[in-house]
A protein has these predicted regions:
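Start-of-domain marker
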Residues: 33-104, 108
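Beta-propeller fold detector
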Residues: 132-140, 205-215, 309-315
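Bacterial Sec-dependent N-terminal signal peptides
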Residues: 1-44
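A cross-kingdom marker for long, charged
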Residues: 271-341
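Short beta-strand elements that form the blades of beta-propeller/WD-repeat-like
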Residues: 101-108, 174-182, 270-276
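Short aromatic loop motif centered on NTY/YTY
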Residues: 148-157, 161-170, 184, 205-302
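Beta-propeller blade signature
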Residues: 118-127, 192-200, 292-304
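Active-site acidic/histidine clusters and adjacent loop/turn architecture
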Residues: 88-153, 257
């Protein structure tokens, strides 16, 4: 290589390296600037959140909440905001799917008469553009007469604070289920098993899905029960007993009954499990402030894209680590999402 060629080649390499450094530097500066902006916004959000849950005056709490909503909406509109954790916001629920397809942010606020208002946002990936879209959730619980049969959206949301996000795969499709809590009012609480999916080529959320085996019209489960009741709705490995029947055979000295029961078998399955509810007073069907657990536990397990019900005796024999099976009871939820006395 002659001197001219060497000099030309060296200049070309230096120009390329300079271009990469400038490009990387500008990207890094943009990333750093974005991060610092998000940190500043998080500090403002944290201050507003503390006011939302510490002020004794209802109007001050809800005014802080409106400012919180506006500030959070601005923060979520920032580039790369999906990947910012908001760790300081420990009084609201933030659940992110393992596949990074979406995250859902929910919280509730109690007014002076003991009723709860629910708020939330969904950030979800538009697979067509690879961009994350943000949707504010509007609680329309009071306007949903057939709540277990309706598909809902961001503008017609059955408000809840979600504490568990369940993901299962079948036939190259991911199915998502949310478990949620609604403080409702001074008489009753609510829990919900809520499927969530997204419109094709969009990040727009769809709440409710026909994924419950042999329950085609059911879009979700909603449980309402007395504020005095301890209700369980969780997802974990559980043990259950089954008794099987076998056709018996005649013997020389014994005529068999049509069927004979085999001894109990104890099996285990990862499932959503919940208490069956019943009114404490006869004739109070539909008056949910009187509903308490009946003592029966029902399970749902995922198979071939559907949630199937286990009707056998589910045993309280969960040996899993508590860290892997955290499901807050109502008292724990009250500590996470504070209520006013």
């Amino acid at each position: 290589m002659n001197n001219k060629s060497f000099i030309s080649h060296t200049k070309h390499n230096l120009l390329f390296i300079s271009f990469v450094i400038i490009l990387f530097g500008s990207s890094w500066n943009a990333f750093s600037q974005n991060k610092y902006q998000m940190q500043g916004m998080e500090m403002i959000l944290d201050t507003l959140m503390q006011e939302m849950y510490s002020s004794n005056a209802s109007n001050e709490r809800f005014l802080a909440n409106e400012k919180f909503i506006s500030e959070l909406e601005d923060a979520l509109s920032m580039e790369k905001s999906f990947f910012y954790a908001f760790d300081k916001l420990d009084k609201i629920s933030i659940l992110t799917s393992k596949d990074k397809q979406f995250r859902i942010i929910t919280w509730s606020l109690q007014d002076d008469n003991g009723s709860f208002e629910n708020y939330g946002f969904v950030q979800a990936k538009n697979n067509q553009t690879s961009e994350y879209e943000t949707y504010r959730l509007f609680d329309k619980s009071e306007d949903l007469p057939e709540v277990e049969k309706e598909k809902l959206s961001d503008s017609t949301w059955l408000g809840a604070v979600y504490y568990e996000l369940i993901e299962n795969k079948y036939d190259n499709k991911t199915y998502y289920i949310l478990l949620g809590w609604d403080g409702n009012d001074i008489y009753s609480r609510k829990r919900v098993i809520e499927p969530i999916s997204f419109k094709q080529n969009s990040g727009k959320p769809i709440f409710g899905q026909s994924v419950f085996y042999k329950q085609k019209e059911r879009m979700r489960y909603v449980f309402e029960y007395s504020t005095e009741a301890a209700f369980t709705l969780s997802y974990d490995v559980q043990y259950y007993d089954i008794t099987t029947n076998k056709k018996a055979k005649n013997t020389l000295f014994h005529k068999a009954q049509p069927f004979e029961k085999e001894p109990n078998q104890t099996l285990k399955e990862k499932m959503i499990f919940f208490d069956s509810l019943e009114p404490t007073i006869s004739g109070m069907d539909g008056f949910y402030q009187y509903y308490v657990p009946s003592g029966e536990v029902i399970g749902l397990y995922f198979e071939n894209g559907k949630w199937k019900q286990i009707k056998y005796n589910i045993l309280p024999r969960n040996k899993a680590d508590k860290k892997d099976s955290y499901e807050p009871n109502d008292n724990q939820i009250q500590q996470l999402f504070p209520q006013k006395n």
